[in-house]
Protein backbone atom coordinates (compact mmCIF):
# COMPACT_ATOMS: atom_id res chain seq x y z
CA UNK A 1 0.00 0.00 0.00
CA UNK A 2 1.60 3.25 -1.16
CA UNK A 3 1.27 6.56 0.66
CA UNK A 4 0.63 9.80 -1.17
CA UNK A 5 3.61 11.99 -2.01
CA UNK A 6 3.04 15.74 -2.30
CA UNK A 7 5.50 18.61 -2.72
CA UNK A 8 4.07 22.07 -2.09
CA UNK A 9 5.82 25.14 -3.49
CA UNK A 10 4.78 28.67 -2.51
CA UNK A 11 6.13 32.14 -3.15
CA UNK A 12 8.46 33.28 -0.39
CA UNK A 13 8.03 36.93 -1.39
CA UNK A 14 4.74 38.81 -1.11
CA UNK A 15 4.10 39.34 -4.82
CA UNK A 16 0.71 40.82 -5.80
CA UNK A 17 -0.01 37.48 -7.50
CA UNK A 18 0.45 34.57 -5.09
CA UNK A 19 1.34 31.15 -6.53
CA UNK A 20 0.74 27.84 -4.77
CA UNK A 21 1.70 24.58 -6.47
CA UNK A 22 1.02 20.99 -5.44
CA UNK A 23 3.06 18.29 -7.24
CA UNK A 24 1.15 15.17 -6.25
CA UNK A 25 1.33 11.39 -6.50
CA UNK A 26 -1.77 9.59 -5.27
CA UNK A 27 -1.87 6.90 -2.63
CA UNK A 28 -3.19 3.41 -3.22
CA UNK A 29 -6.87 4.02 -3.83
CA UNK A 30 -6.25 7.03 -6.07
CA UNK A 31 -6.67 9.80 -3.49
CA UNK A 32 -4.68 12.82 -2.33
CA UNK A 33 -5.42 15.04 0.69
CA UNK A 34 -2.77 17.72 1.24
CA UNK A 35 -2.80 21.02 3.17
CA UNK A 36 -0.93 24.15 2.11
CA UNK A 37 -0.60 26.46 5.06
CA UNK A 38 -0.03 30.20 5.00
CA UNK A 39 -2.31 33.19 4.62
CA UNK A 40 -4.43 33.29 1.48
CA UNK A 41 -6.62 36.31 0.84
CA UNK A 42 -7.77 37.39 -2.61
CA UNK A 43 -9.43 36.34 -5.84
CA UNK A 44 -8.42 33.13 -7.57
CA UNK A 45 -7.55 34.22 -11.10
CA UNK A 46 -6.08 31.09 -12.67
CA UNK A 47 -5.75 27.38 -11.97
CA UNK A 48 -3.97 24.74 -14.02
CA UNK A 49 -4.57 21.03 -13.58
CA UNK A 50 -1.76 19.13 -15.29
CA UNK A 51 -1.63 15.34 -15.41
CA UNK A 52 1.52 13.23 -15.50
CA UNK A 53 2.12 11.18 -18.64
CA UNK A 54 3.28 7.60 -19.09
CA UNK A 55 3.08 5.16 -16.21
CA UNK A 56 1.95 7.74 -13.67
CA UNK A 57 -0.80 9.27 -15.86
CA UNK A 58 -4.02 9.47 -13.82
CA UNK A 59 -7.21 7.70 -14.73
CA UNK A 60 -9.22 9.84 -17.13
CA UNK A 61 -11.97 11.96 -15.55
CA UNK A 62 -10.45 12.21 -12.07
CA UNK A 63 -11.64 14.91 -9.66
CA UNK A 64 -9.80 17.84 -8.05
CA UNK A 65 -11.06 20.16 -5.32
CA UNK A 66 -9.26 22.83 -3.33
CA UNK A 67 -11.04 23.49 -0.06
CA UNK A 68 -10.69 26.45 2.28
CA UNK A 69 -10.77 26.13 6.08
CA UNK A 70 -14.59 26.08 5.97
CA UNK A 71 -14.64 23.15 3.54
CA UNK A 72 -15.78 25.21 0.53
CA UNK A 73 -14.40 24.16 -2.86
CA UNK A 74 -12.77 27.36 -4.14
CA UNK A 75 -12.88 25.89 -7.67
CA UNK A 76 -16.70 25.82 -7.48
CA UNK A 77 -16.79 22.26 -8.84
CA UNK A 78 -14.77 23.12 -11.95
CA UNK A 79 -12.12 20.52 -11.08
CA UNK A 80 -14.55 17.64 -11.64
CA UNK A 81 -13.88 15.10 -14.39
CA UNK A 82 -10.38 16.29 -15.32
CA UNK A 83 -9.10 14.82 -18.57
CA UNK A 84 -5.74 13.11 -18.26
CA UNK A 85 -4.94 13.84 -21.92
CA UNK A 86 -4.26 17.59 -21.62
CA UNK A 87 -3.72 20.32 -19.05
CA UNK A 88 -6.99 21.86 -17.91
CA UNK A 89 -7.02 25.62 -17.29
CA UNK A 90 -9.61 27.40 -15.19
CA UNK A 91 -9.19 31.12 -15.84
CA UNK A 92 -12.74 32.45 -16.00
CA UNK A 93 -13.12 34.57 -12.83
CA UNK A 94 -16.82 33.73 -12.64
CA UNK A 95 -15.92 30.06 -12.08
CA UNK A 96 -13.75 30.49 -8.98
CA UNK A 97 -14.21 32.01 -5.54
CA UNK A 98 -12.56 34.61 -3.40
CA UNK A 99 -10.47 33.07 -0.68
CA UNK A 100 -9.68 34.21 2.87
CA UNK A 101 -8.19 31.27 4.68
CA UNK A 102 -5.09 30.09 6.52
CA UNK A 103 -5.17 26.66 4.90
CA UNK A 104 -6.03 25.37 1.42
CA UNK A 105 -6.50 21.63 1.05
CA UNK A 106 -5.92 19.89 -2.26
CA UNK A 107 -8.10 16.82 -2.66
CA UNK A 108 -7.83 14.45 -5.60
CA UNK A 109 -10.16 11.48 -6.09
CA UNK A 110 -10.46 8.69 -8.65
CA UNK A 111 -6.95 9.24 -10.05
CA UNK A 112 -5.86 5.61 -9.82
CA UNK A 113 -3.14 4.00 -7.70
CA UNK A 114 0.15 5.92 -7.57
CA UNK A 115 -0.79 8.40 -10.31
CA UNK A 116 0.29 12.02 -10.44
CA UNK A 117 -0.03 15.56 -11.61
CA UNK A 118 0.59 19.19 -10.76
CA UNK A 119 -2.04 21.68 -9.58
CA UNK A 120 -1.08 25.36 -9.75
CA UNK A 121 -3.25 28.06 -8.18
CA UNK A 122 -2.82 31.82 -8.63
CA UNK A 123 -4.44 34.27 -6.18
CA UNK A 124 -4.59 38.02 -6.81
CA UNK A 125 -3.99 39.35 -3.31
CA UNK A 126 -6.65 41.59 -1.79
Task: Enumerate the language-model features and the residues they cover.
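Surface-exposed, low-hydrophobicity beta-strand/loop segments enriched in small/polar/acidic residues
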Residues: 2-126
Amino acid sequence: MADQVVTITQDSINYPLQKIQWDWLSATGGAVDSDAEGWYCGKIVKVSLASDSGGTAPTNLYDVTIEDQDGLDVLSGNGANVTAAATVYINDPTKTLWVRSNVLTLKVANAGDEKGGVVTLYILRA
